[in-house]
């Protein structure tokens, strides 16, 4: 049986991925990849930063949990990606363009000196972002929040942070 999103989440949330760190390919969790300074393969550093800042405003802890490495590594898988957008009607082969468009919109809007990530997410939720092109802002809000939740709380450690017993249908083989 192939790897499914359900299997990834049941197996500890964010499965280990392969990340370029310091010029070497390393198997690591998104959190570790971020801590070690991963090099994005699909998104730019600016796009990663915009997704992380906004994702962390939606789900505190998402930045530290490795939201950008998680999204970037999944986008690098093409049709094998397990990002939620795939299950919400975004063609797996079009996910890179979808996430780039979201990130580019975030970059433009976060560049305004009087705009915080928290203010921007509020505007995204109501589709009232003045400078937004591409996927609807509320849809981007939903997708980014779901990805941030997956990487932050889709692990045994995430459940512990919520003081919820971790009861996976399939226990992960290893913890990270």
Regions found by a protein language model. Give the residues of each.
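A generic secondary-structure boundary signal that marks alpha-helix termini
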Residues: 17-18, 63, 153
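C-terminal segment of N-terminal export signals and the immediately downstream linker at the start
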Residues: 2-7, 19-57
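Sec-dependent signal peptide hydrophobic core
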Residues: 12-16
């Amino acid at each position: 049986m192939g790897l499914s999103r359900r299997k990834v989440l049941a197996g500890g949330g964010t499965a280990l991925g392969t990340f370029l760190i310091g010029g070497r390919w390393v198997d690591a969790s998104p959190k570790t990849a971020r801590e070690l300074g991963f090099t994005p393969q699909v998104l730019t550093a600016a796009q990663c930063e915009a997704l992380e800042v906004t994702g962390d405003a939606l789900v505190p802890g998402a930045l530290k949990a490795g939201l950008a490495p998680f999204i970037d590594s999944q986008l690098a898988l093409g049709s094998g990606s397990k990002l939620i957008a795939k299950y919400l009607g975004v063609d797996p082969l079009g996910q890179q363009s979808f996430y780039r468009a979201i990130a580019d919109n975030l970059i433009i809007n976060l560049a305004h000196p009087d705009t915080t990530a928290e203010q921007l997410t509020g505007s995204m939720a109501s589709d009232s972002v003045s400078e937004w092109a591409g996927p609807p802002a509320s849809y981007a809000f939903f997708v980014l929040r779901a990805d941030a939740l997956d990487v932050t709380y889709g692990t045994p450690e995430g459940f512990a942070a919520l003081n919820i017993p971790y009861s996976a249908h399939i226990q992960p083989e290893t913890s990270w």
